[in-house]
Structure formats: structure tokens, C-alpha cells
Amino acid sequence: MGIPAAFRWLSTKYPKIISPVVEEKALVMEDGTVVPVDATQPNPNGEEFDNLYLDMNGIVHPCSHPEDRPAPSDEEEMMVEVFKYTERVVNMVRPRKLLMIAVADGVAPRAKMNQQRSRRFRAAQDAKEKEEDKQQLLKMLQKEKGSTAKEEPIETVVKKAFDSNSITPGTPFMDILAASLRYWCAYKLNTDPAWAKMKVIISDATVPGEGEHKIMEFVRSQRNSPEHDPNTRHVIYGLDADLIMLGLATHEPHFRVLREDVFFQQGKARMCKLCGQKGHDERNCRGEAKEKAGEFDEKDKAEPLKPFIWLHVSILREYLAIELNIPNLPFRWDLERAIDDWVFMCFFVGNDFLPHLPALEIRENGIETLMAIWKDNLPVMGGYVTKDGHVDLDRAQYILSGLAKQEDSIFRRRKETEDRREAGFKRRKLNNQQGNNRGGAHDSPLSGRGGRKGAPEANGPPVGMNLFPVASIPKPVITHDMVVNRANVANKSAASVLKSQIQSLVAQTQEKPEGDEPKEENPEAKTPPSALGKRKAELIEEGTATASDAASDTETPATTSSEEGPIDTVRLWEEGYADRYYEQKFKVDAKDIAFRHKVARAYVEGLAWVLMYYFQGCPSWEWFYPYHYAPFAADFVDLGKMKISFEKGRISRPFEQLMSVLPAASRHAIPEVFHDLMTQEDSPILDFYPEDFEIDLNGKKMSWQGIALLPFIEMPRLLDAMKTKSHLLSAEDKARNAPGHDVLLISDSHPGLYEDISSHFYSKKQAVPEFKLDPKRSDGLSGKVRKIEGYVPHGSLVYPLERNTMPDVDYDRSMSVNYDMPTSSHIHKSMLLRGLKMPTPALDRSDVDFVRSKGRGAGRSFGGVPLRNNYNGGGRGDRINYAGGPPRGGGGGGRGRGGYQQDRGYGNGYGGGGGSGGGGGGGGYGNGYGGYQQPAAPGQQSWQPPPPPGYPGFGVGVPPPPPPAHASGGGYNQGYGNQGYGGQNYRNDRYPPGPPPHGGYQGGGYPGGGYQGGGHQGGYQGQYHPPHGQSQDRRHDNS
């Protein structure tokens, strides 16, 4: 998912969702014999798993260009690495029922192609620049070494990198990968006892859809089956952050995400990408050949394997149950719907289909800001924002309007933070320079000891001067970083170079003592992550976010210095930023307000598209967001009047996607008949493939954070141009361009299913070409299977690659059939299934306190402070309220810190820090929700939300009846972040039928909105019956 640093943010905010994987390693005997892992044994992690889903993008990318070892020399070596990595993951999880492998993304929706196009063009551009730097390094090294160079040619040191753009549907590489994985899975079914009863589904790149979304489509399809076991335990492997959101969207609590611990030994030097040696990175590469450890390098020590971690979706659900719960809503509380709303709000901060809103950054508590807005508005919205993957636009308007209230403040606060960081860097840089200067004076040879006392000889050196032969002075070592920096200087504009020179001269005359030589600085040159593929880019972004959040003191000039970066002419922190934004980014008149609303409507369409894509599957294969930039929150108006609908549209063919997303530099992955369309001057679509394009940093510092301003593909033009060449395709090319099918592989050891398939397809009867699986005989798998044309069972299994690295199998005991997922007329419901046994709660009271303490003021600390509520006129006011609706009254609840009353009988009066208006929380502000103390269910802690009927431990349903005796409460006494959801006293025998009244004389800012300033009493205006012996006057009715 396109949320940089999302995984790190989640694991920091909710620490218990992460745990290390216990991995059993193969044993190496003294004689070198390797004893493999016995995966038939119980899982060492203490829990058995049913289904494992592999998003192979997260395996293919690290195997094709690893960080800790040299890259594979060819595709066959790469396939072997893929086999090893996959087997390691399978042995960790040990699935007992099913393994699904999404070999790679198939043809993607058009909305995704734009992002793929940007990444691949950037990757090609970065690879070109990197190759030019390599060649320049070679020339400089050859010139320097001359006749003293070693016998081996230097060209063998620098290798050409694998083109990651080949990992795209329709390329020959993807054909090789799919065939290799089909062989390997069949081989394991024949030889590994742990695979004997496992079903394997392979969905290769010929099957349309992104890998992770094909996996989720399978999960939803099985979930809709009446025979589905609701307690199935799922594990999905992948490096994408959106796997977490997709796991939540399944509403399957027994779900885990498996991934590498990408932060393991983060500070350790990586292997050089240029020469393949350890101990330095490519910035400091000197182009020297590797020294062998032993005659054949057999003594070279292998790096320790990177550990893996679990992300527990069930524990994340527990955290969200605490964070999102709002007691005493005027409608039924439903955790499943609240989780869907939370996932929807995360889309605003980033996704792969839309640019994020300018005011929202995950590093600036963007998600917490939206959560605060959602909490304030939920009671007045009348329900949840989403339902089963559909968005209620009237309620979404509340969220965006609440964000618009603090948009200006967020931009100003962001600028202040950047300025402080910049000033801190300059201060540290100056201190370091002054320290170096003092050290240089202290260590001067003139002050050295030794030599004769007295005046020096007239023609001799000063006394104490240490003399060295000129030939002994080492020459400056040429490194790759020097080449890159010289190229960067050469690419600067004349004005930028002149400015830098003037500034350096001024600095030297003002700061440098006489006699000091100027020192050349080599700012760190980072490899843009787009060159490493989608998954690698996200991991680098996570690491960058971590560095910026946790250790801003260590930032380098390349990341912080505004002197080297372009000037931000939009200046979001200054008045008039919206006009400048639309003039410069969209090239439209600043007074064209209708255009702003048009952009906002397209963005809302995109949000609706993304939500349906995550919860129901792709709503349209042709829709896309037609702008490079997002609108402001203030531009979203009258959303409730919009009518959004999508047409399924046409699914592109693989070659059409290749022509849509690949640059001309990667045309080797495209059939040769189309090459002229990408390169020739007379091509009608030549403008789709610019060699040079603008990168708009859009206020960022690093080039990889910028926006590639590429022209959007006009699909009718592209298709018309391709039609003129399609008849020239070879039969092999046409086969690669055809849509494919999922394949199901089983062993003859699988009871029931193997017999059913054999009798239907390969017996003398052979009645039908397809049949529906019986879940009772297939161990829970639903769907249809079809015979593969030309496939003959019980033949030989042949290794598909040339060097025969893996053996052939003479008698293949596995069987392969085409597989179709079951279809259903029912939509995927956001609900827990009947018969589900919830996982044992993992959080205790200390975890709840931790979440609430971390949430104190969350979403209001960046931009929301020190905004004040100006509605209460003259009072001190409090932090701004995000809830929609006009102000009605004010008043100083508690210590006179005002609020205002909402017009739906819901009290939003802000109580003071304790006292009568403390809102039950002893501080913060009282939102007047009028909580009441629920009795604890059996096995449930008193602080947990009430469970729904039949599902202990989670507050997703109506609360149980109140106890017979009257219970006084403070609701959630600490509130959420000490926001003080107020309490009330009630008696069970005095309530009328229906939900208890909301509001209450003890809570919500005394009483529920403040009474000292004449504000209206808060709370939902329901019927109230005081306990016996108490006066009705204590309610402080509105007057």
C-alpha cells in the first residue's frame, strides 16, 4: 500500500501486534551432510495453520537483486533462489490444508497502471544514470591504474543489474517463473511428506489482478461458501503494507501477516551493488576485484539469514476495539463496521491509486487526526461511514469538513517543524566545523615537539616541521560517489552553481582561518528506491520515515539542506496557497473554483473505487484518477449530491499493459514488433514514451519522493496503434498475450480429492469437462475444476530450465487441473461468521492504559494545537471540535473551558481539567457521550467493551441488559486519551424499553456541555428517571 512507513507506524503504535517467528533450521552435520527440516512435526510457534498465501512479488524482488550477497548471474540461478526462499517460508508456517501462490501481479486495473508506469519509468531512468556512473568509474579507474592494473579486466567487476521491469505480466521472464514454480510445487508434492495432503493453487501472471487482491478474492470466495470453517487459520506472506489492511477487510480474526524483519541489523553496511563485495556500499566503491577466501572462495562466510516476524491481525483488532469504541451511541455499536471506517480513513493518507491529501502525512499523525474527527462526528452522523465496501458520501463529508478546519494550521505547523529541523542541522554543522578548525590548529605541525630550540635556518623548514617525501603522499582514492557528485554538479543549473560558488566563497572568507584548505564535502547519494521495484521502494520509505522521526539529529545535508533543493513556490504555509497550488500544479486559473470541485469529485470517486476494490473486488478495470495531484480538504463540498457508479469495463491484455507501463529503455521485455511504436519519430504514440520527464519534488527534499509528471496513457490511441502490428506476433508471443487460469495441484496421497478428479477426468467414463468440488472430500475447498487440455497424468515431471539444476521425476504422482473460484450473488459482508471462536485476548489492562495514554490528544497534536474553538465568543475556549453542524451555545464546563452544543441533542461541551466538568476522566475534555458502566461478561475484564451476543470479548453488538441494582459509573472513566466520556447513574427498573438515555448529570462537561456559561445540557435527550430518593432537579434540564 502506498503509505510510506505504515508498517513501522503500526508496530510502534500497537507494539503487541508484532512477534518474532520461531524458525527451525536445517542441521549441518560434521561431515557436511544437511538434515532438512521435518515440516511434518508440530509448528514450533505453538499454533498450527491451515492456509498459507504467498505474494511472490515479495520473494522474486529480493531474490533477483538481494542486499546481502551478489545478484544471481542468470535466470536459472534466480529460480533456484526463489525455490530456497519459498521453501523456507513454507517450513516456517507449515500449512496443513492449502498453499496459494500468487506468482506475480497479473494485468492490473487501469487505476494501478498509472502508478506502475511512474515506478517503471523512474526505475529505467535511475538504471540509465547508474550505468553511466559505472562506465565513468571504469574509465577513471583504468586511467588511474594504467599499467599497474591487475591481470583480470576491471569490466568483470562491474555487472549489469537485472532489469526489475521484467517482473511485469507478458514478459518472457514471467513465463519462466510460472513454469519453474509449477515444476517445483509438483516436485515437492512428489518428494516431501509435509506436502502430501496439501492442496496447491498457483495463480500466475496470465490471470488478471494484483497478486494480493487475487488472494483476497479467494478468501472472500471461500468465506461465502456455506461449508467454510470460520475458524480457518490464515497466514499471508508479503512485504506490502496493504496486506494488513486487506487482512482486516476479510473480517477473519484468525489471520496473520508474515514478513521479513526489514529492520534487522539496519545499521550494518550492505553489500556493494557494483562489485559484489562486503564492507562498503556503492558510494565508496573503488572498483577493486574481490579477494577470494580460499582457492575457490569456499571459505567466504555467509551472512546470517534475516529473521521473520508475525503481524497478528487479531491483536490489531483488539487495539482498534479500544481506540475506536465510543460508548452510548444513538445507534448500535459494531466493531466490524468501525474497523472498515478505519481502513477507509487510512486510504486518505496513502494508497497505490490516489495521491494522498496534502494535509495528511503519516509522520504527522495523519491517521490519528482522522480518527479524532471520526470520533467527534460518529454520534451526529447517524451511522458509520462505510458499509460492506460502499461509502456513505453524506457521512464522508463530515470527515473531510473536519479535516478542512485544521488544514491551514497543519501546513503552518509543518513549516515550523521543517524550519526547526533545518536550523538544528545548520547549528550542528557549524559546531562540527568549528570543532574541526580548533582541532586542526591544535594538531598543527608547527606546534609539534622535537627539533632544536631557537630560530630556524634561513633556507630551511620551520623547527619541528615533519617532512615527508612527495611520492609518499597518497593520491586521493577514486570512488563511485565522486563520480556521482561530479555528475550532480554538472547537471546543476548555471544559477544554482553560481549561487553555490558565491556562498562557498563567502563562507571561506568569513569562517575559515587563514591557511586552512577547503575541504570537499560529499553529500550522501542515495539510490532512488524506484530502481529497486515496488516492494523495495516501500521498505526504503519505511526506513527513511524511521530515521526522520526518531533521529532527526543525524540527517545529512542531502536530506535537509534547503540550499541545494528547489524553491517551494507554492508555500502552503502562507496565505493564498490554494490559488498558487492550482495555478502551478494544475495550470488553471486560480479563480476557477468549479475546477477545484471537479478534481475533488474525481478524488471521491477514487476513494469509493479503492474501498470497493479492497472489500468486494475490482469495481471497474478502466477507471483511473486523471490528475497527478490531490485536492485540498476544503475543496470537497456537497458530496451527498454525488451519484457514483462504475462499469466493469474491459480487462487489458498483457502486451497492452506492457506498452502502457514500460519505458522504451525496457522494450527488450516487449515483443519486437512493437518496438518501433516506442522509438520511431513517425510513431503515433511516441509521446507516451518520453526519455526525459520532469520530477516535481512537490515540497519534498529527495528526488525519489517527487512526482513523475508523465503523460497519461490514452487507451484508444494505444490500442489503435497496436492493432497495426498485432498480426506480426509469433505463436509464442500470442500465447503469452492470452489470459490464463489458476491451476490446482494435488498429490495422490490426498484422500478423496485425488479420486474425485481422477474419476471425473481420467477414467473410462469422463462424463463432464468440469465439476464442482465437494468441500467434505476436498478438505474444505470450494470451487470448480476443469481438465487441462493436453495434460496427461502419471507421466514424467521434467525440469523446465536448461542446466538441469533440479532432477526430473520419472513417475509424477501429482495431478494438475484448472481451478475456478466459487462465485456468489451475495456480497462480502463485514461481519463475523457464525460459529467463530475468537482468539484468546492478548491485551491486558496495562496495554489498554498504554493505548489510551498514547492516544491523549492524538490527532490534535499536529495542526490541531493550538487551534481554538472560536464559537464560544469571548471565553478562553478549547481545542477545536471537529464535529459538523453549526454552533449552538457555549459555556464553560467545569473550569470554564468552553465548548458548543450540537444540534442533534448530542452534547459536545468541553469540560475542564478535573472538577465538576472533568467529564469523568479527570482531565482532557468531556464529549458528553454519557457513558454508563456495563457489567463484565464472564471471562471479561471490566474495562473491556461489552461483547455482542455469542462472541465474547469484542464490543460489536448491542450491550447486554443493565444489572438489577443501580450502578454509578463514569462510563469509560479515562475516556479515550483522557477525553472523559461522561457517566450517568441509572436503575434497571426505571428505564423504559429501548436504549438507556444518553447524557447524564455527572459527565460530559457538567452537565454534558457546560452549565456555567448558559450552554445547553448535553447528551441525547431521552427520557430520564432518577434513582429512588434522588431529585429530578439534579438533571439540570435545559432552560
From Swiss-Prot:
Annotated EC: 3.1.13.-
Keyword rRNA processing carried by entry: yes
Region described as Disordered: 414-462, 508-565, 869-907, 930-1039
Protein known as: 5'-3' exoribonuclease 2
Zn-finger region bounds: CCHC-type: 270-287
Oligomeric form and interacting partners: Interacts with RAI1; the interaction is direct, stabilizes RAT1 protein structure and may stimulate its exoribonuclease activity. The interaction also stimulates RAI1 pyrophosphohydrolase activity, probably by recruiting it to mRNA substrates.
Stretches with biased composition (Low complexity): 542-564, 932-943
Keyword list, A-Z: Coiled coil, Exonuclease, Hydrolase, Metal-binding, mRNA processing, Nuclease, Nucleus, rRNA processing, Transcription, Transcription regulation, Transcription termination, Zinc, Zinc-finger
Organism: Chaetomium globosum (strain ATCC 6205 / CBS 148.51 / DSM 1962 / NBRC 6347 / NRRL 1970)
Xref: PANTHER family: 5'-3' EXORIBONUCLEASE 2, 5'->3' EXORIBONUCLEASE
Composition-biased stretches (Gly residues): 886-899, 968-983, 1000-1021
Matches recorded under CDD domains: PIN_XRN1-2-like (cd18673)
Molecular function as annotated in GO: 5'-3' RNA exonuclease activity; RNA binding; zinc ion binding
Database matches in InterPro entries: 5_3_exoribonuclease, Xrn1_helical, Xrn1_N, Xrn2/3/4, Znf_CCHC
Subcellular location, record wording: Nucleus
One GO term describing the cellular component: nucleus
Function: Possesses 5'->3' exoribonuclease activity. Required for the processing of nuclear mRNA and rRNA precursors. May promote the termination of transcription by RNA polymerase II. Essential for vegetative cell growth and chromosome segregation.
Family: Belongs to the 5'-3' exonuclease family. XRN2/RAT1 subfamily.
GO biological process: DNA-templated transcription termination; mRNA processing; nuclear-transcribed mRNA catabolic process; positive regulation of chromosome segregation; rapid tRNA decay; rRNA processing
Residue stretches in coiled coil: 119-147
Basic and acidic residues bias (residue ranges): 414-425, 511-524
